[in-house]
UniProtKB/Swiss-Prot annotation:
GO BP term (any one): thiamine biosynthetic process
Cofactor remark: Binds 1 Mg(2+) ion per subunit.
Molecular functions (GO terms): magnesium ion binding; thiamine-phosphate diphosphorylase activity
Enzyme Commission number, as recorded: 2.5.1.3
Regions annotated as coiled coil: none
Stored NCBIfam families: PRK00043.2-3 (NF000736), thiE (TIGR00693)
Source organism of the structure: Flavobacterium psychrophilum (strain ATCC 49511 / DSM 21280 / CIP 103535 / JIP02/86)
High-level lineage: Bacteria, Pseudomonadati, Bacteroidota, Flavobacteriia, Flavobacteriales
Official protein name in the record: Thiamine-phosphate synthase
């Protein structure tokens, strides 16, 4: 099954991205989602090639946010697709059955939709306010996660659900009690002054 901790990369330049990704990898994170927006496609390709090599060095899973064709071109482990990105069926045709395709959801109905579309895991959020995303869906909180997980149980839906959006270390125990499978974090790791201690604690809690 998939690692329960996913780091979504941050950084406005290739150098910043690589620094942050290496920080996550060398301190124990085994799953990287590369997210590099608002830049030239050549920069995204250059970064993706470098991150792939880095993830191979640490035997970590490497997926790319949004860019199915790039994931195919460099043979990444998969992609993560938002609700307004390429549809999952089309991505599956391009990437094949063996690749990981994650999908975003904000409601139980969207979880069912993503499951029917045959994605491998769902990023469900946001948990709370986050500055990482400009257009934020309605915040779910612990109550929202608990409700959606209970609804999934009644439907016998076992797709892995990752909590995402503004998660802090002190939230993790309560989030996991809702029945969530794992967490995806960005700023929490990027901004950490002691990433080894943080990631070790996160991996223990998960």
């Amino acid at each position: 099954m998939y690692n329960k901790l996913q780091y979504i990369s941050q950084g406005k330049t290739i150098e910043e991205q690589l620094l942050n990704i290496r920080k996550a990898l060398e301190n124990g994170c085994q799953w990287i989602q590369m997210r590099f927006k608002d830049t030239h496609s050549d920069n995204v390709f250059t970064l993706a090639e470098a991150v792939k090599r880095m993830c191979q060095e640490y035997t970590a899973t490497f997926i790319i946010n949004d860019n199915v064709y790039l994931a195919k071109k460099i043979n990444a482990d998969g992609v993560h697709l938002g609700l307004n990105d390429m549809n999952i069926a089309e991505a599956r045709t391009i990437l094949g059955e063996a690749k990981i395709i994650g999908g975003t959801a904000n409601t139980f109905e969207e979880v069912l939709q993503r499951t029917a579309e045959n994605c491998n895991y769902i990023g469900l959020g946001p948990f709370q306010f986050t500055a990482t995303k400009e257009k934020l869906s309605p915040v779910l909180g612990l109550e929202g996660y608990h409700l959606i997980i209970q609804q999934m149980k009644t439907k016998k839906n076992k797709i892995p659900i990752y909590a995402i959006g503004g998660i802090q270390l002190e939230n993790v125990d309560d989030i996991m009690k809702t029945g969530i499978y794992g967490i995806a974090v960005s700023g929490l790791i990027t901004q950490s002054e002691n990433p080894f201690q943080l990631i070790t604690q996160l991996n223990k809690k998960l």
